[in-house]
Regions:
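Conserved alpha/beta-hydrolase "acid-adjacent" motif
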Residues: 266-272
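C-terminal catalytic histidine-bearing segment of alpha/beta-hydrolase fold enzymes
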Residues: 274-322
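Alpha/beta-hydrolase active-site loop
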Residues: 113, 144-165
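An N-terminal hydrophobic leader/cap segment in hydrolases
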Residues: 33-80
Length: 322
């Protein structure tokens, strides 16, 4: 019997992938990594830096009107918040109404945003304290928080009237947009505020960020919105879970609140004012939805119908603070 050596079996030759495929694979992997970094890091961080560093926009910095422009005497004032921010403002003493209204403006604006409606109410006898919110106008530098830390500015204004000026006037907090949010949050914490006028307030931190992200940038809440909220809270050092305006309205209790919305405002539509109104407990709370030219612009209820706006505010204040 003869045996033969097994024949050598040749292993199949593996073909090397073309070089262009290897390069393409690396490019795709690199692009995926860059997209992940953009979505989870660069875009949210950049937006958070923009929000928390917000100040008065250039077109508002050029404004020079003061109460004196409208023939109303005033004095320049300064006071400090509980977290050490210097706040600059104007004070117009009350005449026969024995009520001083604290005016809080919106993001990127200044005390001049509310000047004309303040003058209208001053002519009816109400006092006015208009101020620049932290990091805006002439006030001191601080990280912006869309209303949560800004509540300390409102509280400081009320404290200035009570403790430094020893005013016996009733104090009303009147804000627009971010300023309305700050006014409601402040009123929930201090009994010195007798009533609130809230024009175009936010609903909560989460809702505000998510809503604006979709409305203006058409970006998804996940992952960008979640990361953006994290970075805003980290930079401005606050807890977004405590930034709940609905809860603040409930805590204000039976103190009167007037909620205002421009009829076709897409940023803070009337439905939000309605939700806040429904959350209130005061039998003296009111809801005003203003129609007229420009009622599709955020916070432009006054501009849409100034006569109706001021008449309703005066009526509310006389009823709320007899």
């Amino acid at each position: 019997v003869t045996t033969s050596e097994p024949a050598d079996v040749e292993e199949p030759v593996r073909k090397k992938r073309p070089r262009w495929r290897r390069i393409l694979k690396r490019v795709v992997i690199t692009l995926i990594i860059l997209v992940v970094i953009l979505l989870f890091g660069v875009i949210p961080w950049g937006l958070a830096a923009l929000v928390t560093s917000a100040g008065t926009r250039p077109m508002d910095r050029g404004l020079t009107e003061t109460p004196a422009t409208f023939g109303v005497q005033f004095k320049d004032i300064e006071f400090q918040t509980s977290d050490g921010v210097r706040i600059s403002g104007w004070l117009v003493p009350a005449r026969d109404k024995h009520t001083t209204i604290i005016y809080s403006h919106g993001l990127f604006r200044s005390r001049r945003e509310l000047l004309e409606r303040a003058i209208d109410l001053c002519r009816l006898g109400y006092g006015a304290l208009l101020y620049d919110s932290r990091n805006h106008g002439s006030s001191g530098k601080a990280r912006v928080s869309l209303g949560y830390n800004e509540r300390l500015d409102v509280e400081a204004a009320a404290r200035y009237l009570r403790d430094e000026l020893h005013s016996t006037d009733k104090i009303v907090a009147f804000g627009i947009s971010m300023g309305a949010t700050a006014a409601l949050l402040a009123a929930a914490e201090t009994p010195d505020i007798s009533a609130v006028i809230s024009d175009s307030s936010f609903l909560s931190f989460d809702h505000t960020v998510d809503h604006h992200l979709k409305l203006f940038l058409h970006l998804p809440v996940f992952p960008i919105g979640n990361e953006l909220k994290y970075f805003i809270q980290s930079r401005a050092r606050f807890d977004g879970a405590k930034f709940d305006v609905l809860d603040a309205v409930k805590r204000i209790g039976d103190r009167p609140i007037m909620f205002i919305a421009a009829a076709h405002d897409k940023r803070m539509p009337p439905e939000i004012a309605e939700q806040l109104y429904q959350a209130g407990e005061s039998p003296k709370r009111q809801l005003l939805v203003v129609e007229g030219p420009g009622d599709n612009v955020h916070g432009h209820g006054y501009q849409a119908n100034p006569k109706l706006y001021i008449e309703r505010l005066d009526s509310f204040l006389q009823t709320a603070l007899p």
